[in-house]
Structures are given as structure tokens and as C-alpha cells.
Amino acid sequence: MLYLIGLGLGDEKDITLRGMEIAKRCECFIETYTSKWEGDLRSLERIIEQPIKSVRRKDLEDGQKEFLNNCKEKNVALFVLGDPLAATTHIDLILEAKRMKIDVKIIHNSSVFSALGEFGLQMYKYGRTVTVPFSNKLESVKDAITNNKKFGLHTLLLLDLDAEVGLYMTVKNALKILLDAKLIKKNDKIIAGKIGTNIYYDNVSNLFEKNIETPSCIVIPGKLHFLEKEYLEEIL
């Protein structure tokens, strides 16, 4: 059997009680290529009283069947940063497991999508979410921002990363890309920050002066409800 266990947005202490109990009776693996983990692997091993092997992207994509064959003979737990179903990689893994008649159990945890409430915007007013890429391929970003604005919806922009080599797009990098593409203006008021730490609602020009940790994200607000506006101006 395969268990996909979310680790949440923080460190090893964010594992759920259910996830911890299940992991104690499994062969355990962890992937850290979909985001940046703030935790410590050795501390997590002490919590679950089991050794944990790290797996890379190619292990779960190119070596998918080999990984899943292991789940036919024993209980296997794969630790995933955030929530297990926030990345398409894990959807594909589940589909292949089902084709191989392997049972899969999801242990959910918090993700950037569930923690967005910290920004003070109403959840049902978010439109399409996109990632600002390192490449110049911005068509999907342009479409999302334009269409969301048309309907007064907020746009969540995730920032590109390559965790396996420790490369994370900064807010400053993303703002420059968006400015160069004329998708935002220097006097636009937007939200930028790292959930759980420093979050700012300010003009784009002022955000360049902020020291924002990675991984971070940006929200371009749509039409604001008066309560949303009060929260942004008084809390952030």
C-alpha cells in the first residue's frame, strides 16, 4: 500500500498525528523537489522512529513503476511538502498505482492554497492560479491576470523554482518580469510575501525594497470588498 503524507508548510513539527502514526509502520521516503522544506530530516526520523530515504524527481517520474512495485509487497509512505495533491506529479503517481492495483491513501496537510486566508482576501474570489516562470513563456500568466481582472477576481502567482539545485525565484525577480511584460505598473498595490512570515501589501515600487524570504508568492487583487480592503490596510 502507498501512503502519501503531507508535511505542511513549516518544518517536521507540522506532520499530523495521523501521518506520524501511519509512518511508524511503513518504509518511508521523502521528496523535496516540489518546494523548499524548512524542516530537518533527522528530526523527522526521530519523530516517526523510522529511517527516511530521499527521492528525486526522476525517481518518481522515470522510475515510477520501480518505486510502485515496492508498494505491492509492503506499506510505503511518501512524505510530500505541503499537501500531497497540490502537485501534478503525485496525481500521476496515484493514477499509475491504481492501474497496478495498489491501494493509495492520502493524508492531507496545509498548502499555499489552504493558507491563503492569511492574505485577508475572500477565498471564493480567487481566479486561475499560475506560476511566473524563469523562462520568457508568459502566455499563461498574461491570460490569467487579464481574465481574472475582467471578472474582478484575485490572481495568485506562484514563483518558479528548481529545488533540486536550490534555485528559487525571488519576489524582486518576479516583479521585474511582470513589469517588463507590462502586466503590472510600479504604482499598483499588490500583495507579496512568504506565508507564515513577512507579508506586505504595498506599491510595486516599494516592494522592491522589501527583503522577502523564499519560497514566496504574489497576489494581484481584483475588485476588493470593503472588509478585504480594511484587512489589507490595517493588518498587512
Please place each PLM-identified region on the residue numbering:
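A contiguous loop/helix-start segment that scaffolds small-molecule binding in enzyme catalytic cores
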Residues: 2-4, 148-236
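Class I SAM-dependent methyltransferase SAM-binding "motif I" and its flanking Rossmann-like core
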Residues: 82-155
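Structural motif
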Residues: 1-3, 27-28, 52, 75-78, ...
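Short, acidic/turn-prone active-site loops that include or flank metal/cofactor-
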Residues: 8-10, 33-36, 56-60, 110-112, ...
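Short amphipathic alpha-helix with an adjacent loop that forms part of the alpha/beta core around
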Residues: 65-70, 145-146, 206-210
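Conserved beta-strand termini and adjacent loop/short-helix elements that scaffold enzyme active sites
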Residues: 55-57, 107, 192-194
